[in-house]
From Swiss-Prot:
Family the entry assigns: Belongs to the universal ribosomal protein uL24 family.
The keyword DNA-binding belongs to this UniProt entry's keyword annotation: no
Stretches the record annotates as Disordered: 1-25
Alphabetized PROSITE patterns for the sequence: RIBOSOMAL_L24 (PS01108)
Protein's name according to its UniProt entry: Large ribosomal subunit protein uL24
Gene designation: rplX
InterPro entries from the UniProt entry: KOW (IPR005824), Rib_uL2_dom2 (IPR014722), Ribosomal_uL24 (IPR003256), Ribosomal_uL24_CS (IPR005825), Ribosomal_uL24_KOW (IPR041988), Translation_prot_SH3-like_sf (IPR008991)
Summary of the function given for this chain in its UniProt record: One of two assembly initiator proteins, it binds directly to the 5'-end of the 23S rRNA, where it nucleates assembly of the 50S subunit.
Molecular functions per Gene Ontology: rRNA binding; structural constituent of ribosome
HAMAP family, sorted: Ribosomal_uL24_B
Keyword annotations from UniProtKB, A to Z: Ribonucleoprotein, Ribosomal protein, RNA-binding, rRNA-binding
GO biological process, one term: translation
An annotated GO cellular component: ribosome
Keyword Manganese listed: no
Length: 105
């Protein structure tokens, strides 16, 4: 998967199209990512010992990785991701600027 935790992405499809946010978590087996402030759902929570009031909680749900695009670190525009070997290590690069994408977990 070309998106990692901590990456800044832009939603390119779906109800939250155009929104930008940071990737909170990834689910590689399902090809899904959770983006901060995107795809907010309401979850009905029963009262429990830890949360005696219960109620309706708002939380972020996962969206498919094909609906987000990585933001170029140089220009802050959506870009595709490429891979290149530098000093024997495989690194991600932004296709638009050629800039190396650093992981900021």
């Amino acid at each position: 998967m070309h998106i990692k935790k901590g990456d800044n992405v832009k939603v390119i499809a779906g109800k939250d199209k155009g929104k930008e946010g940071k990737v909170v978590s990834t689910e590689p087996k399902k090809d899904r990512v959770v983006v901060e402030g995107v795809n907010i759902i309401k979850k009905h929570q029963k009262p429990t010992q830890f949360n005696p009031e219960g109620g309706i909680l708002e939380t972020e749900a996962a969206i498919h990785v094909s609906n987000v695009q990585l933001l170029d670190p140089k220009t802050n525009e959506p870009t595709r991701v490429g891979h290149k070997f530098v000093d024997g290590k495989k690194v991600r690069i932004a296709k638009k600027s050629g800039e190396e994408i650093k992981s900021n977990n």
